[in-house]
């Protein structure tokens, strides 16, 4: 399917249209939320200033008997409905701003900084499915 209607837009656009970037970001955040809850981590969503700097969220695990201090990971949240996999089929190839990549890979950062990419179906109608048997598939 080349074009699809998304409830927040009045017209159909190609699924790769930039208008869907906000929807993709919110879906990646929504996907990470129950994962953090399951492992007992706190998910802190950052405000626009940090988001513009490349940090969308911070995941923290509290101290426990094996870890005396909290474990903190900064996260850049992304999503794509047109993933590119390398020739070996092992790695996702994902374009990002050079400046953000340099910040993420800097040795001067205070904690690990991960890129979290949610791979969505190509068909927008399959991004979120709600039916009487399941809340969200």
Q: Can you describe what each PLM-predicted range is?
A:
Residues 1-53, 59-137:
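Mixed-charge (Asp/Glu-Lys/Arg
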